Swiss-Prot record:
Nucleotide-binding is among the record's keywords: yes
Name of the protein described by the UniProt record: DNA topoisomerase 2
Presence of the UniProt keyword Nucleotide-binding in the record: yes
Gene for this chain: TOP2
Segments crossing the lipid bilayer: none
Residue stretches of biased makeup (Low complexity): 9-20, 1351-1360
Site feature location: Important for DNA bending: I845
Residues engaged in binding Mg(2+) 1: E461, D538
Effect after changing A1245G: In strain: cv. Kas-1
Catalytic activity: ATP-dependent breakage, passage and rejoining of double-stranded DNA
Residue sites binding Mg(2+) 2 per the record: D538, D540
GO MF assignments: ATP binding; DNA binding; DNA topoisomerase activity; DNA topoisomerase type II (double strand cut, ATP-hydrolyzing) activity; metal ion binding
Misc. remarks from the entry: Eukaryotic topoisomerase I and II can relax both negative and positive supercoils, whereas prokaryotic enzymes relax only negative supercoils.
């Protein structure tokens, strides 16, 4: 191997002479002159900017050190000269990283001698000959290019050197360069001199030194000619001196730094930063700049202060001054800006601050040690190394970031944001000009002129109100009156962003019309185009909201205007007008309380008045508009500013910062508190607290349901109309929307109403546990979470059979019905037999509050109600969703509520296939499929090889095909987490309106149930009182009717050929009990009022007719005089007396009945309906599984499962004997937590009627199953009870659902010694003549029988009570439960001219007649019914499933609740109705 020759001297003698030059053919230059090759040394001298930067003078504003302080000023310097000095200085600092014992750096800058020296202690350069290069190491690294100790990138170094130039560049650009070093390890001292730009060198001088001597010193004289300089100028010296201070700041207190023999007074990086801040503070008049410091670790030290409008940074990487920053500065700054952005936007969401905005307000100092740093050039002004290669992390602490946030930067940014916003908003400023072009503005002629202060701008709610205002303006003229219609509600500018405000055309128009200038302080209106703004809106809640938004708009930008007298006024119109019949006397009422007060003063006698409601300005005619403007003093109310409380009230209503205060404001609302519209002035605080609060309460009520019935007002209106219109027959949803608007005074959008109806009928998994309406059509599925429902024009609905059991008709008379526009509408709340808010859950977001209540198992709710009735403690309930096959487990609990984890189901089919068979609640199939398809691997490839969906609208069935590698990755991460098969819900945000209408937070479902229980029990007591009262009235009627008939038959009372008044007087004299009908209330004469109950027969109540004026005179004996002529028979008397005897017994029995018994009876009825739902759900699930098997069989998909996901743990066994009530309750439930039911079997029937049931019972009985297990192998239909062997009657008489049940049916319900006649669905159903009380006054009655008809009632002998009939076996058929059809051949329609010409015989008498008719028509009726298909056979009572008895035990989560961990409250938001 050849020995490598030593390096040659880098002087001109070493350069070989070129051969003789050959001349080029043209151009006067030889080829050699045109194309040259330079040595590296020549290249550096020829192109120095590549290595040391420019050698020309530059002027730049920089920090320099002079006169013992830091100064920022323009500096003229040569960057190349500064760089060669910096290279030697950085080398000295680098030695600290090599030798921690280094303790001093001495710098001398001698201007006179043009000499600079840098000496540092610590390990010197090894004084030893390099074995490969054959020269001493000091000469090698200082005198030969591309030599360095930093070439090994496998070794992480935190020094400045990297490329092998460094000190050699200083040598090259110096006339003299001296290197001296002492190597104590080798006891040698080294000195060598280079001259002529490293072109000449002396031989090294080696001498001995002590072991303790370790240092290195570089002395050089810059070649000033190459920098176009003659001496070291002051600016250059000041810049070099500042660089020495840099080194002192970077090295810290362990190294003493001297400059020209004087120690630098900087012992830490913090001291160094203070030099800058002290200098900056001299020019500040406000508080000194803050200095926030954090030494993150040994490699990172950060200081932060404030800057004004421009980002500043002072940073170092391994002692190198990165004057242009770099990735290390970005790394630190991004953490600070992200924190500040969040803090600013939290304080003012409209600030719209971005990271670069924050950066412009920061001054950041960074001192970092970074492994093997990389820069943009040899000048090393910018670090370019990626953050991941830094070799260390700089994660600023939260405490430090908070301190930065409190340093004033947030306030600075908020001020800057305000300034920017104002600047943007000023672009839309108005001006006092004579003419503005704004669409739909009817400008006043004098607006913007010298009389502008006298002009009034009327702002109306929409175009229709504008028409009224223009009609009224014709009275005043258009010189001083302008009109502008608002398009709906104005933007809440207090919470809007600048972009929203500037893009809002309405606000821009108002500023132009009024001549408003942004944020100007107005002491008067002289500079405006209008001197007064008058708000003219509807007298409803939305109208109040519009007023409030306009007030908020002015207060946000021009609060002083609200203090200008009479600037802001409102124009009010009557809500109700009462006109005296026959005269022109008109009374106007401007508030409902005022009207109610007048109505009460009439004492019910308002028949002489016509009442008209004015809900909107559009109701008033043009003539009325002129009338209003003719008397402006009566209709115009001035808003008055009293004190700062007015401003606080406005902020309370509209500021997001006042959320908690707004909650308290709404909580303290007292119903009935309202503005007195008779006062001429209104303070802003009164407006907010007495009028605007009504809108907020209405908004809240539309969003948060009632604890009592679980309904929002819109849903309650739907149910109110459903009871009237769709109890028996289905109707299009679109039609029902119209009826709800008509009959319940619904004033909002039809689309939201249709959505609410659809929502009440939905029954897919995750929607309702019990849907109150039936979904006859496509009402949405779990495929898209209900969004796939059909248009309201195409789908039908009707009342679900279970709804009337949940909301018994007997309670309707006890409810507090509302009245709007003189129309009787829905009650304040309905009174279900269990808290339906727990059954179907609730969700919503309103003013100040939101709510989320999960669904719970109705079986568990019923069981807990029974426990409360028995004086036992409730069993805690967990959320439950009908049809959901996954698990719901309590994962955390604390005082504020519990958190539950909802988990879907998956199975491992084989090594590469996962089957998902259930998703968490409210995770829909389509969304989930999109999620699966979006999953990617780390390299961007699809995670699954294929996603196969076998699910339908009711089921979940996905097969995920993936590689073995991805299967392993998914298993390691966890299938539940990877495939998002879990979600959480919480009970920490359960807000509801209580029975008094006050918003209240509930912590547990048991708390809701307990509060409901007390109220519901109170209403059962009221129901009993009402039933007893009605029965006693019926008893008196029976006695009076029998006595009346006998008196007529005996001639004691003569009715023919006499005046009614005389007969009434006879009856009064003979002591017959009067039952007058209620007189029509004052609302009966209201224009346009529609009340579907108007056609109902007036209520008859036992009263003293002399003492009340609210009843119709002469009507007190109509119940006798309106009896049919056929009733005047001895048989009828006997029948009435028999009914009376029964009634006496019934009254006595009812008085003995307890409210508890009534409730238990209703719960028993509910249990039966739930069993029908169980059966249907089981059948549906069986059909789903069969269909899925067929789909898989056709597609060839795998059916066998390798491994199944863990099932829900089975309930723990207990040796404790269950209580009797618990055993009974467990036997009711078809909603067991056991998911492995092989067979659903109905129990054997009791003895009942051997009738064939109608076909629809199959449908109704199987309406819905509530088992958590849907894997049912077989469904066995129930057998009917044995009953009387009788045939179907000739014609079943239709009963309107919105009538009360017949008295006999109600009595049977309360007669607990025998089976109820209706609620238990016995074989025999009592029949009554059906009377349609709808508005068209049409009566449906049974026509006479064609053959085998019964004899006239007068010729019949009274029959004793019928003996119990034997009941035959029942089979499930398809007739609706409770439906009594009427044969088409037997129906006749008869128009009645008066609502009072009905038969007035008692309910009991009609019942008795009906039974006789049924008995006499057995044979003929049977054949007739078979032909017509319109008759319905008796329905036997469905029995509970013969399932094993269950006992209630605590689940794992309940028994271990003491160990539950704390969790954070989860607040959910939701939607309107």
């Amino acid at each position: 191997m050849a020995t490598k020759l030593p390096l040659q001297n880098s002087n001109a003698a070493n350069v070989a002479k070129a051969p003789a030059k050959s001349r080029a053919a043209a151009g006067g230059k030889t080829i050699e002159e045109m194309y040259q090759k330079k040595s590296q040394l020549e290249h550096i001298l020829l192109r120095p900017d590549t290595y040391i930067g420019s050698i020309e003078k530059h002027t730049q504003t920089l920090w320099v050190y002079e006169k013992d302080e830091m100064v920022q000023r323009p500096v003229t310097y040569v960057p190349g000269l500064y760089k060669i000095f910096d290279e030697i200085l950085v080398n000295a600092a680098d030695n600290k990283q090599r030798d921690a014992k280094m303790d001093s750096v001495q710098v001398v800058i001698d201007v006179e001698q043009n000499l600079i020296s840098v000496c540092n202690s610590g390990a010197g350069v090894p004084v030893e000959i390099h074995q490969e290069e054959g020269i001493y190491v000091p000469e090698m690294i200082f005198g030969h290019l591309l030599t360095s100790s930093n070439y090994d990138d496998n070794v992480k170094k935190t020094t400045g050197g990297r490329n092998g130039y460094g000190a050699k560049l200083t040598n090259i650009f110096s006339t003299e360069f001296i290197i001296e070093t002492a190597d104590g390890k080798r006891l040698k001292k080294y000195k060598q001199v280079f001259e002529n730009n490293m072109g000449k060198k002396s031989e090294p001088v080696i001498t001995k030194c002590n072991k303790s001597e370790n240092w290195t010193k570089v002395t050089f004289k810059p070649d000033l000619k190459k920098f176009n300089m003659t001496e070291l100028e002051d600016d250059v010296v000041a810049l070099m001196s500042k660089r020495v201070f840099d080194i002192a700041g970077c090295l810290g207190k362990s190294v003493k730094v001297e400059l020209n023999g004087k120690q630098i007074p900087v012992k830490s990086f913090t001291d160094y930063v203070d030099l800058y801040l002290s200098a900056a503070n001299k020019s500040r008049t406000e508080d000194p700049l803050p200095r926030l410091t954090e030494k993150v670790n040994d490699r990172w030290e950060v200081c932060v202060s404030l800057s004004e409008g421009q980002f500043q940074q002072v940073s170092f990487v391994n002692s190198i001054a990165t004057i242009k920053g770099g990735t290390h500065v970005d790394y630190v700054t991004s953490q600070i800006t992200n924190h500040i952005v969040a803090a600013v936007n939290k304080k003012n969401k409209n600030a719209n601050v971005k990271a670069h905005n924050v950066k412009n307000h920061l001054w950041v100092f960074v001192n970092a040690l970074i492994d093997n740093p990389a820069f943009d050039s040899q000048t090393k002004e910018t670090l370019t190394l990626r953050q991941s290669s830094f070799g260390s992390k700089c994660e600023l602490s939260e405490d430090f970031l908070k301190k930065v946030g409190k340093s004033g930067v947030v306030e600075n940014l908020l001020s800057w944001a305000d300034f920017k916003q104002n600047k943007d908003l000023k672009k839309s400023d108005g001006a006092k000009t004579g003419r503005v072009l704004v669409e739909k503005l009817d400008d006043a002629a004098e607006a913007g002129g010298k009389n502008s202060r006298l002009c009034t701008l009327i702002l109306t709610e929409g175009d229709s109100a504008k028409s009224l205002a223009l009609a009224g303006r014709s009275v005043l003229g258009n010189n001083y009156c302008g009109v502008f219609p608002l398009r709906g509600k104005l933007l809440n500018v207090r919470e809007a962003s600048t972009t929203q405000i500037t893009n809002n055309k309405e606000i821009e128009n108002l500023k132009k019309i009024l001549g408003l200038k942004q944020n100007m302080k107005y002491e008067n209106v002289n500079s405006l185009r209008y001197g007064q703004m008058m708000i003219m809106t509807d007298q409803d809640h939305d109208g109040s909201h519009i007023k409030g938004l306009l007030i908020n708009f002015i207060h946000s930008f021009w609060p002083s205007l609200l203090q200008v007298p009479s600037f802001l006024v409102e124009f009010i119109t009557p809500i109700v007008k009462a006109t005296r019949k026959g005269t022109k006397k008109v009374l106007s009422f401007y508030s409902m309380p005022e009207y109610e007060e007048w109505k009460e003063s009439l004492k019910g006698n308002a028949t002489g008045w016509d009442i008209k409601y004015y809900k909107g300005l559009g109701t008033s005619t043009a003539e009325e508009g002129k009338e209003y403007f003719s008397n402006l003093g009566l209709h115009k109310k001035d808003f008055v500013w009293e004190d700062e409380q007015d401003g606080e009230a406005i902020e309370l209503a509209f500021s997001k910062k006042k959320i908690e205060a707004r909650k308290n404001w709404l909580s303290s609302y007292v119903p009935g508190n309202h503005l007195d519209q008779r006062q001429p002035k209104v303070t802003y605080s009164d407006f907010v607290n007495k009028e605007l609060i009504l809108f907020s309460m209405a908004d809240l009520q539309r969003s948060i349901p009632s604890m009592v019935d679980g309904l929002k007002p819109g849903q309650r209106k739907i149910l109110f109309v459903a009871f009237k219109k769709i109890a028996r027959k289905e109707m299009k949803v679109a039609q029902l929307v119209g009826y709800v608007s008509l009959l319940s005074a619904y004033h909002h959008g039809e689309q939201s109403l249709a959505s609410a109806i659809i929502g009440m009928a939905q029954d897919y998994v995750g929607s309702n546990n019990i849907n109150l309406l039936l979904p006859n059509g496509q009402f949405g599925t779990r495929t898209s979470g209900g969004k796939d429902s059909a248009s309201a024009r195409y789908i039908f609905t009707k009342l679900s059979p279970v709804t009337r059991i949940l909301f018994p008709k007997d309670d309707d008379l006890l409810l507090d019905y509302l009245n709007e526009d003189g129309q009787r509408i829905e009650p304040t709340w309905y009174m279900p037999i269990i808290p339906t808010v727990l059954v179907n859950g609730a969700e919503g977001i309103g003013t100040g509050w939101s709510t989320f209540i999960p669904n719970y198992n109705p079986r568990e709710i019923v069981a807990n109600v029974r426990r409360l009735l028995n004086g036992e403690s409730m069993v805690p309930m967990d959320p439950w969703y009908r049809g959901f096959k996954g698990t719901i487990e309590k994962t955390a609990s604390k005082e504020g509520g519990c958190t539950y984890t909802i988990t879907g189901l998956y199975e491992e089919v084989d090594e590469t296939t996962i089957r998902i068979t259930e998703l968490p609640i409210r995770r829909w199939n389509d969304d989930y499929k999109n999620f699966l398809q979006s999953l990617k691997t780390d390299n961007g490839a699809p995670f699954f090889q294929d996603v196969k969906a076998y699910n339908d609208e009711k089921s979940v069935d996905f097969d995920l095909i993936l590689s073995e590698e991805n299967m392993l990755a998914a298993r390691q991460e966890g299938f539940l987490k990877k495939f998002k098969l879990t979600t959480t819900i919480a009970t920490s945000n359960m807000h509801l309106f209580d029975k008094k209408g006050v918003i209240k937070k509930y912590v547990t479902p048991e708390q809701i149930l307990e509060e409901f229980f007390d109220l519901r029990f109170e209403y059962y007591e009221k129901r009993k009182e009402t039933v007893v009262k009605n029965m006693e009235i019926e008893l008196l009627k029976l006695e009076n009717k029998a006595r009346f008939i006998l008196a007529v038959l005996s001639g004691e009372i003569i009715v023919n050929k006499r005046k009614k008044a005389d007969i009434v007087e006879d009856l009064r004299q003979k002591g017959f009990t009067p039952f007058p009908r209620k007189a029509e209330s004052v609302e009966a004469a209201i224009a346009g009022a529609v009340d579907d109950d108007a056609a109902e027969e007036p209520e008859e109540i036992l009263v003293d007719p002399e003492s009340s004026s609210s009843y119709i005179p002469g009507s007190e004996y109509d119940y006798l005089l309106a009896m049919a002529i056929a009733s005047l028979t001895i048989e009828k008397v006997e029948e009435l007396l028999a009914d009376r005897d029964k009634m006496i017994i019934a009254v006595a029995d009812m008085k003995k009945t307890t409210p508890k018994s009534l409730w238990l009876s209703d719960l028993e009825s509910l249990d039966k309906e739930l069993e029908k739902l169980d059966l249907k759900d089981a059948q549906v699930q069986q059909a789903i599984e069969a269909a899925q098997k067929k789909i898989r069989a056709k597609s060839g998909a795998a059916v066998k499962v390798k491994r199944q996901a863990p099932k829900k743990p089975a309930p723990k066994k207990t040796t404790k004997k269950a209580s009797e009530s618990e055993t009974t309750e467990a036997s009711y439930s078809a909603m067991d937590t056991d998911n492995n039911v092989a067979e659903v079997v109905k129990p054997k029937a009791r003895q009942g009627a051997k009738k064939k049931a109608s076909e629809s019972e199959t449908t109704e009985a199987s309406h819905s199953a509530m088992d958590t297990d849907n894997n049912v192998a077989e469904v066995v239909k129930p057998k009917g009870r044995q009953g009387a062997k009788k045939k179907a009657p000739a014609a079943a008489k239709e009963v309107e659902e919105d009538e009360m049940l017949d008295l006999a049916q109600r009595l049977a319900q309360y007669n607990f010694g025998s089976a109820p006649a209706d609620s238990s669905k016995t074989a025999e159903t009592s029949k009554a003549i059906a009377v349609d009380d709808d508005d068209d006054d049409v009566v449906v009655e049974v026509a006479p029988v064609k053959k085998g008809g019964r004899k006239p009632a007068a010729t019949k002998a009274a029959k004793p009570p019928a003996a119990p009939r034997k009941r035959g076996k029942q089979t499930v058929a398809s007739t609706e439960v409770l439906a009594i059809g009427v044969s088409p051949e037997k129906k006749v329609r008869k128009m009645r001219s008066s609502p009072f010409n009905k038969k007035s015989s008692s309910v009991m008498s009609r019942l008795a007649d009906n039974k006789e008719e049924e008995s006499s028509e057995n044979v003929a009726g049977n054949s007739s019914s078979e032909k017509s298909g319109g008759d319905v056979s008796a329905i036997s009572r469905p029995q509970r499933a013969n399932r094993r008895k269950m006992t209630y035990v605590l689940s794992d989560s309940e028994s271990e609740s003491a160990n539950d961990s704390e969790f954070d409250d989860i607040e959910d938001d939701e939607d309107d109705e």
